[in-house]
């Protein structure tokens, strides 16, 4: 019970068996739909499942009567294991050319973003000023008090989105997680090789200063989080424990927080830490939310929250009183920590509109707005003051139940490309243009300080980082070079830098680089004045071996 300390190395269990398509998946499908939607070598998939122990063949009444049955295994959304078909590489996610912004136009978040980016009250021509035009206005004294306001600075930074690869670190296995600390001084990366790497990001650097071997890891580290004081980090895996470890000091002290689950095979897919560092929140494959109190050194809550795996959890703001959860039932639920009880597990409300399982949730940090990524290949923006009706919840549940494809190794069905809004969908906005395959891909709001949270960015199964304009829904940037899906993305809280963590084993830092120089700015002796001059990246000097 409670926690345990460990200073000795341990590797944990190996790769657990995978499940077949999710519980409750639809079983019927017409031959016409099969031919239209399937682009998979079924023999290859069957051989893979047999090799992995997912299914087995048994003889029926006759010698030629063979039956395929599922091996006893929990359904699990996070396991690709040795499947390297990389079907996502062949999938080109359709981009929504005309996003529906009607709900967003009437919402308060539109005013918030316009205020944070210095566009509130401006005419359209003034909103679309180029950077040189903004500088000219400042020189003429037309800016507030002769200088750019905070909103105008955020608008200026929108002209300098990351567009160039500045640093790469390569691992021997898949990179699963990668996040900046709250102050941006540390970047933490978690890889399938059971190693957590910490990078020093102070003064423009990106230099690895510590590698820590994770304990009690089954298959891979699935999620990581920093403590609010920045002195420790937490990680979860296929294990009954969430571990906490020190960042600084000699040696590594791993403390295991025992969640005491009822399931034999147990995994925590998502973790979050309260603002005071006291409580640790986890979402697990048994459909439950777990709360561990670090002061009492015990699990204090086990809430039956979703009908299937809980893939995402997040606190709404710094008060840590309101929290969000999302699962494979396609429902996002809102909870009040002060009223959560094991004997009466009722959320204060629910948000419905997705047609398949939710893979990640990110809060805007104001206890009002959040975004969710989903296997239905969309991101949705929500306002928790607009809960869904029973009709909407039932429509989402039914849509998720009728899904009869497995996102881990199958192509996206063409019917999932349709721009369809379910009855009772209470979302403010839907973003399309990225792929969600193979794993629980993350999406996040861009930082407040540098961008005014005017962007939403996401990983992609096709190896891209996709950046959306929050208000218009259009894709404004795609960062490409990864050879496999990008599972996690993290934007520096104060600088124009994005780090992508990919299943191709690469960690990549993206930053802004001027693509072209005007001829007047080039030396007269230059042979090719229109050719971009080479630019050295200080961070590349810190490229570290694994």
From Swiss-Prot:
Gene3D superfamilies: YVTN repeat-like/Quinoprotein amine dehydrogenase (2.130.10.10). Residues 1-10, 537-546 have a biased composition (Polar residues). Pathway: Protein modification; protein ubiquitination. The keyword Transmembrane does not apply. GO terms for cellular component: Cul4-RING E3 ubiquitin ligase complex. The modification Phosphoserine is found at residues 73, 75. Residues 80-89 have a biased composition (Basic and acidic residues). Coiled coil: none annotated. May function as a substrate receptor for CUL4-DDB1 E3 ubiquitin-protein ligase complex. This is DDB1- and CUL4-associated factor 11. It comes from Bos taurus (Bovine).
């Amino acid at each position: 019970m409670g926690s345990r300390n460990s200073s000795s190395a341990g590797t944990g269990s190996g790769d657990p068996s995978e499940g077949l398509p999710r519980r409750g998946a639809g079983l019927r499908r017409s031959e016409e739909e099969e031919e239209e939607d399937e682009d998979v070598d079924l023999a290859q998939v069957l051989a893979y499942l047999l090799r992995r122990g997912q299914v087995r063949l048994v003889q029926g009444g006759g010698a030629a009567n063979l039956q395929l049955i599922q091996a006893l295994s929990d359904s699990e959304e996070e396991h690709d294991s040795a499947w390297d078909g990389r079907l996502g590489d062949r999938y080109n996610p359709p981009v929504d050319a005309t996003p529906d912004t009607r709900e967003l136009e009437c919402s308060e978040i539109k005013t918030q973003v316009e205020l944070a980016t210095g566009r509130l009250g401006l005419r359209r021509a003034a909103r679309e000023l180029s950077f040189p035009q903004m500088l000219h206005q400042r020189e003429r004294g037309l800016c507030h008090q002769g200088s750019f306001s905070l909103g105008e600075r955020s608008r200026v930074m929108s002209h300098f989105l990351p567009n160039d690869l500045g640093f790469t670190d390569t691992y021997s296995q898949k990179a699963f997680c990668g996040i900046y600390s709250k102050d941006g001084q540390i970047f933490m990366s978690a890889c399938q090789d059971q190693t957590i790497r910490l990078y020093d990001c102070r003064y423009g650097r990106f230099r690895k200063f510590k590698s820590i071997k994770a304990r009690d890891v089954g298959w891979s580290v699935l999620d990581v989080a920093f403590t609010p004081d920045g002195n420790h980090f937490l990680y979860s895996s296929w294990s009954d424990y969430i571990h906490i470890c020190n960042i600084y000091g000699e040696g590594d002290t791993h403390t295991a927080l025992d969640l005491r689950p009822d399931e034999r095979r147990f995994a925590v897919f998502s973790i979050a830490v309260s603002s005071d560092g006291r409580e640790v929140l986890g979402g697990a494959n048994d459909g439950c939310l777990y709360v561990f109190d670090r002061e009492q050194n015990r699990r204090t809550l086990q809430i039956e929250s979703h009908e299937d795996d809980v893939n995402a959890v997040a606190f709404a703001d710094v008060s840590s009183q309101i929290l969000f959860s999302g699962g494979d039932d396609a429902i996002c639920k809102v909870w009040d920590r002060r009223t959560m009880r094991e004997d009466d597990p009722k959320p204060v409300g629910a948000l419905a509109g997705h047609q398949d399982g939710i893979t990640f949730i990110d809060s805007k940090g104001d206890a009002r707005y959040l975004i969710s990524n989903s296997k239905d290949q969309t991101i949705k923006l929500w306002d928790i003051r607009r809960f869904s009706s029973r009709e909407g919840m039932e429509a989402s549940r039914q849509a998720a139940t009728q899904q009869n494809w497995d996102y881990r190794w199958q192509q996206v069905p063409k019917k999932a490309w349709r721009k369809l809004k379910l009855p009772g969908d209470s979302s403010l906005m839907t973003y399309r243009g990225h792929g969600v395959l193979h794993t629980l891909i993350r999406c996040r709001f861009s930082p407040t300080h540098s961008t005014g949270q005017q962007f939403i960015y996401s990983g992609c199964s096709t190896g891209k980082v996709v950046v959306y304009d929050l208000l218009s829904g259009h894709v404004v940037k795609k960062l490409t070079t990864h050879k496999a899906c990008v599972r996690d993305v993290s934007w520096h809280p104060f600088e124009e830098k994005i780090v992508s963590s990919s299943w191709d084993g690469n960690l990549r830092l993206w930053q802004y680089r001027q693509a072209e120089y005007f001829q007047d700015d080039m030396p007269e002796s230059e042979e090719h004045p229109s050719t971009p001059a080479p630019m050295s990246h200080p961070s590349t000097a810190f490229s570290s071996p694994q």
